[in-house]
A protein has these predicted regions:
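Helix-rich, typically C-terminal accessory recognition domains appended to large enzymatic cores
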Residues: 105, 176-180, 221, 226-233, ...
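Basic, alpha-helical terminal appendages of large translation-related enzymes
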Residues: 1-35, 46-54, 337-340, 349-352, ...
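Residue patterns forming the tRNA-binding/recognition surfaces of aminoacyl-tRNA synthetases
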Residues: 2-21, 25-40, 117-318, 325, ...
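Conserved oxyanion/phosphate-binding beta-strand-loop segments in alpha/beta enzyme cores
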Residues: 2, 11-62, 92-101, 125-131, ...
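N-terminal catalytic cores of NTP/NDP-binding nucleotidyl/phosphoryl-transfer enzymes
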Residues: 47-122, 126, 150-161, 322-323, ...
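Long, charged, mostly alpha-helical binding arms that flank functional sites
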Residues: 15-19, 120, 124, 301-306, ...
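Catalytic alpha/beta core of large soluble enzyme barrels
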Residues: 84-85, 97, 340-444, 452, ...
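Flexible, glycine/threonine-enriched loop-and-boundary segments that flank and lead into catalytic domains
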Residues: 290-319, 363-392, 396, 499, ...
């Protein structure tokens, strides 16, 4: 295809200018547009569909899909998208079936907050934002399969989000197999064994004698999706629960309103059941080490012991978890969280006293404030515990630095060897006893010494002595002693908490669950899905002392009957009045599984077509047969389904951890083929922008700064000197660069090339529009290699230059290797080197005497295509490529013989300093290299007649002469 382009009305009408580039790009995007108008370019059929070629290997590449904000994309957003587009085009040329989809993560709090501020419904603003994002992405020319596009707010999508949630609700984690199983199997086991269990009231009953509510409550303690009570940050004024990060000194970050801590029953996910697998299976995937570390730390597996301390006057012991049971002899006091039941009972005995006052104050502090506070606060409970190793009576305190959500909510304090315990003991004059002697760290009593060492002061007259033992051996001996006395046991603990999955907001997926008058919960059937979000004119939060989600206002929707709601009649008679759940799912819900829906987005019968999922997600290691395996085999198959997942490192923990959890549950229950969702993960760096900083480190908006001279900037209003720095692009700093503006000035191909040429993909780097001109000029030179700027005719050398041919082969090889490594900047550098070498001398009368031949230009255009597709397609059309661009083309082959240098440069060192450089044959032997070196004029001058003691020759590398 070679339709005419607009002619520039100057002496070089076919010069590659911004206007020429823009017209060319739009032309090719229009040419590639599908007949239905819904996309352009690449449409990848699934197995069984017309056009599918099962003989090809598959490549599934995925971008972390964007949250479409009203501001649109800035130049930082397309960085990862550009890299994935390059590798997808490369893989297509290499003969792969390529799946590269795009969609929209559209539910969530930002859209709802924007809607409340503007008075425009979030559905309206979100769809408008999606339209703008889609327009921008299409203008880049990315090779997305737009036939697979969806948004998480589409009812046809969130129907299956609700279905997966119901799957979790109807499942439990079997610790014996470490796999999820249907909850119905567990209920059958309880019925068969007539299992005895404790009711919520504390009494014990058997399954056969239990009421339906008691049975349900017992099963709820096993479900993967369950109702649990969590202490939350409730802001009555804002009418919502706030994250810990949104609370500062007991007030909301937004508005400064009072926040109080209160228990709230909410839907949870039992992600902690998967802690070991989430941790261990990180070894199965090709992920950045930094991300593995972040997830490892977040899960926080720690090995230690649970120890039971008797408490005077209490029936039940006080249980603590410690990773250092070897320090038991140094426990001189106990600390429990203000929310601990032991404290609750103590407060009841001390109503209105100092303890009650302290507990009320501490409970209203967020977990982050409690952990971050440098000042140690606490209050004695009046209770005494008994140290089982020493027999000493030790006081029990409550303090806000101990959290109920971690471990048992209680600690044994060993102030000699823990910094926080030492500060607390110093503040309240509590005993400090050294029990570990650490090499190189003498205990002076002025600060804690932490680490491993040998036990001291750790023996009792009864049965336990660990004095002189190193930490590892001492821990083992203490645990054995605890177990022999039935006062403790070995335990593995986790920092990971169960996942709070309820939100008191409107703009999210409704829960497919209802409640009867007694508060029993019932799932709705799959046939009743999707449970759609009702239209609501007033979706603002309700100001209240108790949480009332916005959906509670939709009374016609919330109050219904079991039959109308879609509850199975075997669970509840159809006429029974029920109330729908009014909380909604968090923004994470839709992003936990979207990569699976892309495999078959139009399948109305399955959340993902089993055949399509198996093809795109399951593959063998090491290439070979392209036939899709029928089942996962750990010995031969990749553990992760998506071949390449690219996105920001800010999602290294939560999104990726939640997606892995959902995927493992689906794997256990037979719905997906691999144990991990993502095989290879890559985090692109952030593209920042220039900002300006005052002397006090505060930032000044870009448009409030004047440049006086090169590198000197002042604040326009005050004349104060400011320093240029880099910062994240933001509206407040007015340093956001809109890609629409850059494309208008230079074209999309230049924009894409510059994004990749700025530096390593994984590195953060500042955007500078001034620097983009270099990349634009490179494309101009590439264009002039093939096109006469006056006539538009094809320019090609009559004969091949062997040096250019050799360099072309080396470039083909290097660019391919660099793309696989996602080293796009070095690949572009190789392309620039090739173009510079092939560029004709200025004023050459006969262009056929220089440049590249027609065949060389064709190969060059094909390796340029992944990086600058529009100009490459235009060059291809002028070279006679049939069809629409290079979509049906192949990656050019390279001759291995031409990748080897005929000559190599070898440095010659004399007395350790380089004195000369030799150009010798790559096949030269050591004696030949030695003779050449000794005959070199610069070497002769450096030796200056001195006797040569030794010559060391490393063939192909260096010569070292000692005189």
């Amino acid at each position: 295809m070679s339709a005419p382009l607009p002619i520039e009305t100057n002496e070089l009408p076919h010069r590659y200018t911004a206007a020429y580039a823009n017209a060319m790009e739009v032309k090719w995007q229009d040419a590639l547009r599908w007949p239905d108008g819904n996309g352009y370019g690449h449409r990848q059929p699934n197995p069984g569909e017309p056009g599918f070629d099962g003989s090809k290997p598959k490549f599934y590449c995925l971008d972390m899909f964007p949250y479409p904000s009203g501001a649109g994309l800035h130049v930082g957003h397309p960085e990862g998208y550009t890299a994935t587009d390059i590798i997808c085009r490369f893989k297509k040329l290499k003969g792969f079936n390529v799946l590269h989809p795009m969609g929209w993560d559209a539910f969530g709090l930002p859209a709802e907050q924007y809607a409340i501020q503007t008075g425009v419904h979030p559905e309206v603003t979100t769809k408008k934002a999606i339209d703008n994002f889609r327009r921008q992405l299409r203008r880049f020319g990315f090779m997305y399969d737009w036939s697979r596009e969806f948004a998480t707010i589409d009812p046809g999508y969130y129907k299956w989000t609700q279905w997966i949630w119901l799957l979790a609700y109807e499942s439990w984690f079997d610790p014996s197999t470490k796999r999820a199983r249907p909850i119905s199997e567990l209920a059958e086991r309880f019925a068969r064994d007539d299992a005895e269990f404790a009711t919520e009231g504390g009494s014990r009953t058997r399954w056969s004698a239990a009421t339906p509510r008691e049975r349900q409550a017992h099963l709820d303690t096993f479900r993967l999706a369950y109702i649990g009570e969590q202490t939350v940050n409730w802001c009555p004024k804002l009418g919502t629960v706030l994250a810990n990060e949104e609370v500062i000194d007991g007030r909301s970050e937004r508005g400064g309103h009072p926040v109080r801590r209160m228990p709230l029953r909410q839907w949870m996910f039992r992600i902690t059941a998967y802690a070991d697998r989430l941790l261990d299976d990180l070894a199965l995937v090709d992920w950045p080490e930094s991300t593995r570390t972040l997830q490892t730390d977040w899960i926080g597996r720690s090995d230690g012991a649970e120890i039971h301390f008797a408490v005077e006057g209490e029936r039940e012991p006080l249980t603590v978890f410690t990773t250092r049971p070897d320090t038991l002899f140094g426990a001189t006091y106990m600390v429990v969280a203000p929310e601990h039941p032991l404290v609750t009972r103590a407060v009841a005995r001390d109503a209105g006293g100092k303890l009650a006052e302290y507990v009320a104050w501490a409970k209203n502090r967020s977990d982050i404030d409690r952990q971050a506070s440098k000042e140690k606060t606490g209050c004695a409970t009046g209770l005494l515990a008994v140290n089982p190793a020493t027999g000493a009576r030790i006081p029990v305190w409550t303090a806000d630095y101990v959290l109920m959500g971690y471990g048992t909510g209680a600690i044994m304090a060993v102030p000699a060897h823990d910094g926080r315990d030492f500060e607390f003991a110093t503040e309240f004059a509590l005993p400090i006893v050294q029990v570990v002697e650490i090499d190189g760290a003498r205990f002076t009593g002025e600060c804690a010494t932490s680490g491993e060492g040998r036990a001291v002061n750790s023996a009792n007259a009864a049965t336990l002595s660990i004095d002189g033992l190193f930490t590892t051996e001492a821990k083992t001996k203490v645990i054995a002693w605890l177990e022999s006395k039935s006062i403790g046991t070995h335990r593995v603990n986790y920092r990971l908490r169960d996942w709070l999955f309820s939100r008191q907001r409107y703009w999210g997926e409704p829960f497919p669950i209802v409640y009867d008058a007694l508060g029993n919960h019932y799932p709705i059937t799959t046939a009743a899905l999707p449970l759609t979000l009702p239209p609501l004119a007033d979706y603002s939060p309700v100001e209240s002392d108790t949480p009332q989600p916005p959906l509670a206002k939709a009374t016609a929707w919330t109050h219904t009957t079991a039959g109308a709601a879609g509850v199975d009649s075997s669970l509840l008679p159809a006429h029974t009045p029920v109330v729908r759940e009014t909380n909604t799912m968090p923004g994470w819900a839709g992003s936990c599984w979207y990569y699976l829906r892309y495999c078959s987005p139009s399948d109305a019968s399955h959340f993902v077509s089993p055949e399509a999922e198996r093809y795109w997600m399951l593959s063998r290691r090491g290439g070979g047969s392209h036939e899709t395996p029928t089942t996962y085999d750990a010995a031969t198959c990749h553990a992760g389904g998506v071949d390449l997942y690219v996105g920001g490192s800010e999602h290294a923990v939560l999104h990726l951890l939640y997606a892995r959890f959902w995927h493992k549950m689906l794997f256990d229950l037979g719905h997906v083929s691999t144990p991990e969702p993502m095989g290879r993960l890559f985090h692109q760096g952030m593209i920042t922008s220039y900002a300006y900083q005052r002397a006090d480190k505060s930032l000044v908006a870009v448009d409030e700064v004047t440049e006086r001279s090169e590198g000197e900037f002042v604040e326009t209003k005050t004349g104060e000197r400011v320093v240029q720095t880099v910062a994240k692009m933001s509206k407040s700093l007015r340093n956001v660069v809109n890609p629409d503006d850059v494309i208008a000035e230079y074209g999309a191909d230049t924009f894409l090339l510059y994004e990749m040429y700025m530096g390593p993909l994984e590195a953060s780097k500042p955007w500078n529009t001034r620097d983009i001109i270099g990349v634009f000029r490179f494309l101009q030179r590439a264009w002039r290699l093939a096109v006469d700027e006056r006539t538009g005719a094809l320019l090609a050398a009559a004969q091949s230059d062997p040096k250019i041919e050799k360099l072309l082969h080396r470039t083909i090889h290097k660019v391919a290797e660099d793309i696989e490594r996602l080293s796009m900047n070095t690949a572009i550098a190789a392309l620039i080197e090739l173009v510079n070498a092939a560029t004709r001398p200025t004023g050459m009368a006969d262009p056929t005497q220089g440049g590249m031949t027609r065949d060389q230009l064709d190969r060059f255009a094909r390796i340029l295509w992944p990086f600058a597709p529009h100009i490459a397609d235009e060059l291809g059309a002028r070279l006679g490529v049939q069809g629409v661009g290079f979509y049906a083309s192949t990656w050019p082959a390279c001759d291995a013989a031409l990748l080897v240098d005929d000559e190599v440069e070898i440095p010659v060192q004399i007395q350790g300093k380089i004195k000369a450089r030799l150009m010798v044959s790559a096949k030269a032997t050591a004696p030949e290299i030695e003779a050449t070196a000794l005959a070199h004029a610069e070497v002769v001058a450096a030796i200056a007649g001195r006797p040569v003691k030794k010559i060391i020759v490393v063939a192909g590398r260096m010569v070292n002469i000692v005189v």
